[in-house]
């Protein structure tokens, strides 16, 4: 078609014998936000390199603006995974340097500088060094540098990895505004919740395009629905339902089976996964599956609080399709040699809690209620006149997964470093594994695992050398080291590659090895600081399966993440804003706390509607999701007519609207913004 600005026909790219891209076909229209998703090594970055004109294809045809990609480079902005900012230059100096490279006139530079600095809310910080910016601000500056030449096409390779949810939403609002000006945007992202904002999405796997469509088309093609099941007996319920699914698979392959399960138990269950205080079950027919689940729970005498039917997410689509292609990571049991963190502790279990008058009727299974592993009281940390952590109170039990969430600079990493003894607090008290005094002792550190934001691996050592080093640091017995190392290699899919230099691994693979290094010694307490940043959805699911396994064996786990869909897997969580803990609770409790309703509107001229409503409402209350508008209203009965009137007075037609549940990201942004508005 003439209107298509990107045309790809039978594109292939080989690196020696490795075929990275295998005969793909794609067309992308002007002004479209097009998402490219896939596991690590799927071929996304190679495709971006070819589109940007920095790499030649092995075969096939690629046209960008009806030119060869190399000839279209003046009209293409490209933001790589590791965007190239000069950290010792200010925002203004970075912008001026980039404008000089692109030969932008002074007049055009000043016009574009004023426009985009205001759009990205960076005008107040123009003299700040790039090295002193938060992750979200660096990402906005890098985007500005890519926009300086007013490109017609913008290529963004995982631009929001490691960026907090508030900044990510602001970033996507900027992208929507740019697309409304006619710029075509192609974006690769490991965050499938944000990929749902794209007009169309392509799923790439092992160099091939498996599926292309809108979010609605991809969901419909799946032909499945999702049940959210809440129960106190999470572990037993998940195990029972997973076994039921496996029996179903066996019966489909073999007409007769010796397993004790009836046909009605197995027809509809496709996938089962724990998400914090609930189970997510992917099913063929919601009504029939709900009846089956209730029957299984009744037969096993399991607690059942609630079942809700919801639409599948893009992650459900992604994981199901890759599972059909046989690419699900193998689950290998951890070679555990000692009891879990809480086993045998005096006062643990339900009876110990009841004797102390504590509540046992909530989302954690009774078996996981044990003594407190981590406790902080009035914790404070000052750096000169700056208070990074302000009077934080925290309790985490053995067997619990606790999520510590907050925007960049909220104080999460500082809090973790204090709790695990790497930083001295300015004030407050800490208890770690029962120790209150010497938190730096070698004996205590061998009972703790820590995976930092910056990989704790040595790039110039091989994978095997790194793992052997950490076995020594953590005192893993010599007799079991080989077994533990073999487990890490097998879990990471690196058997036979253990002599590769760690620096040669992609970021997602490094994360897996770093996690393995942090748990080989079977810690009682595990600190994970953004462990899945940049990791693809399949690997992320494997991470959380392992995290849940360690928690169920008694390990206390504190995890930070910017990906709030995965934060739903935590039993409890706390939100930090500007160094303060502003709320704590289970994912369900926090979502239930939100005032008002989240309204989804199908309307004409989505960008114009967003711009208009942001002048009437606080800007954080309005966000574009694909071709829909999401609006947070505190009093929907009175505000919806007002919103419709505002839009219709500007000749913007509202086709339909409905109330939808708050996601954890919606809740997080609402809490952060309301706290800021209240001046806390």
Model-flagged regions — what are they?
Residues 129-133, 501-505:
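Conserved ABC ATPase signature
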Residues 96, 100, 107-125, 468, ...:
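Conserved ABC ATPase "signature" region
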Residues 154-157, 526-529:
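Catalytic Walker B motif of ABC-type/P-loop ATPase nucleotide-binding domains
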């Amino acid at each position: 078609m003439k209107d298509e600005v990107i045309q790809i026909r039978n594109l292939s790219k080989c690196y020696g014998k490795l075929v990275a891209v295998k005969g793909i076909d794609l067309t992308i229209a002007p002004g479209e936000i097009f998402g490219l998703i896939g596991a690590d090594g799927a071929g996304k970055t190679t495709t971006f390199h070819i589109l940007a004109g920095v790499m030649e294809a092995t075969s096939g045809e690629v046209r960008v603006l009806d030119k060869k990609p190399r000839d279209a480079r003046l009209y293409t902005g490209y933001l790589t995974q590791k965007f190239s900012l000069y950290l010792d230059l200010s925002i203004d100096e970075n912008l001026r340097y980039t404008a000089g490279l692109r030969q932008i006139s002074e007049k055009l530079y000043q016009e574009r500088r004023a426009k985009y600095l205001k759009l990205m809310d960076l005008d107040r910080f123009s003299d700040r060094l790039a090295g002193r910016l938060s992750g979200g601000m660096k990402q906005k500056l890098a985007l500005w540098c890519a926009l300086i030449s007013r490109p017609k096409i913008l290529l963004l390779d995982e631009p929001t990895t490691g960026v907090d949810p508030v900044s990510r939403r602001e970033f996507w609002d900027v992208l929507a505004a740019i697309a409304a000006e006619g710029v075509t945007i192609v974006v690769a992202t490991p965050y499938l919740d944000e990929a749902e904002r794209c007009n169309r999405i392509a799923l790439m796997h092992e160099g091939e395009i498996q599926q292309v469509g809108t979010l609605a088309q991809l969901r419909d093609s799946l032909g499945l629905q999702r049940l959210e099941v809440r129960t106190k007996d999470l572990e037993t319920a998940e195990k029972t339902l997973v076994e039921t699914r496996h029996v179903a698979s066996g019966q489909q392959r073999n007409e007769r089976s010796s397993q004790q399960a009836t046909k009605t138990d197995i027809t509809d269950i496709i996938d089962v996964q724990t998400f914090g205080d609930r189970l997510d079950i992917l099913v063929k027919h919601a009504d029939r599956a709900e009846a089956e689940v209730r029957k299984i729970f009744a037969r096993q005498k399991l607690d059942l609080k609630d079942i809700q039917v919801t639409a599948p997410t893009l992650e459900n689509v992604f994981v199901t399709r890759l599972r059909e292609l046989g690419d699900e990571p193998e689950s290998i049991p951890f070679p555990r040699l000692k009891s879990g963190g809480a086993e045998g502790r005096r006062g643990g279990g339900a009876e110990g809690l009841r004797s102390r008058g504590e509540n046992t009727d909530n989302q954690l299974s009774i078996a996981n209620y044990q003594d407190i592993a981590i406790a902080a009281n009035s914790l404070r940390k000052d750096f000169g006149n700056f208070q990074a952590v302000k009077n934080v109170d925290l309790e985490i039990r053995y067997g619990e997964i606790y999520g510590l969430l907050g925007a960049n600079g909220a104080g999460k990493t500082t809090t973790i470093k204090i709790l695990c003894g790497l930083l001295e607090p300015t004030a407050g008290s800490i208890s770690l594994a029962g120790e209150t005094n010497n938190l730096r002792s070698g004996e205590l550190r061998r009972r703790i695992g820590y995976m930092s934001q910056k990989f704790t691996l040595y790039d110039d050592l091989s994978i095997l050398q790194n793992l052997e080093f950490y076995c020594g640091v953590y005192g893993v017995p010599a007799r079991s080291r080989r077994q533990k190392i073999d487990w890490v290699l097998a879990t990471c899919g690196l058997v036979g590659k253990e002599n590769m230099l760690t620096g040669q691994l992609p970021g997602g693979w490094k994360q897996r090895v770093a996690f393995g290094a942090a748990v080989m010694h079977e810690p009682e307490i595990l600190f994970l600081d953004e462990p899945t940043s940049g990791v693809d959805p399949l690997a992320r699911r494997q991470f959380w399966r392992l995290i849940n396994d360690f928690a169920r064996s008694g390990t206390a786990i504190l995890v930070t993440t910017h990906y709030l869909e995965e934060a739903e897997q935590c039993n409890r969580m706390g939100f930090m804003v500007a160094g303060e803990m502003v709320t704590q609770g289970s994912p369900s409790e926090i979502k239930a706390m939100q005032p008002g309703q989240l309204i989804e509107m199908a309307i004409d001229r989505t960008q114009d509607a967003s711009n208009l409503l942001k002048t009437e409402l606080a800007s954080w209350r309005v966000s574009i999701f694909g071709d829909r508008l999401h609006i947070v209203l505190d009093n929907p009965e009175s505000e919806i007519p007002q919103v419709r009137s505002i839009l219709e007075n500007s000749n913007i037609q509202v086709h339909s609207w409905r109330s939808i549940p708050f996601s954890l990201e919606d809740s997080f942004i609402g809490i952060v913004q309301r706290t800021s508005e209240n001046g806390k």
